[in-house]
Amino acid sequence: MYSTSWCGYCARARRLLQSKGADLEEIDLDMVANARTEMVARSNRRTVPQIFIGERHVGGSDELLELEAAGQLDSLLDGPPPQ
């Protein structure tokens, strides 16, 4: 998740993902050189948070909450079934 320490939407997304036991890797745009450039290249968006589950771009906080409301977030976090 690309984020900043002062972003309320980032905090909301972080809390939800932590409550799900997700292995959360945060990239703070204020602390990591070139992180914003990388985020925009990967997501084509300039706002934070930008959330990826694996390599899949989920979107921002609103999209994450929509996935949770639709009952789809847990299966995304669990990953694909073993083959």
How would you label these PLM feature ranges?
Residues 53-82:
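Non-catalytic, surface beta->alpha helical segment in thiol-disulfide oxidoreductase systems
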Residues 8-11, 34, 59:
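Residues that form or flank phosphate/diphosphate-binding pockets in enzymes
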Residues 15-17, 40-41, 66-67:
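Short, glycine/charged-enriched secondary-structure capping and boundary segments
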Residues 1-23:
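Local sequence-structure signature of Cys/Sec-based thiol-disulfide redox active-site neighborhoods
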Residues 29-46, 72-83:
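Thioredoxin-like thiol-disulfide oxidoreductase module
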Residues 20-23, 36-48, 52-58, 62:
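Structural alpha/beta surface segment adjacent to cysteine/selenocysteine redox centers
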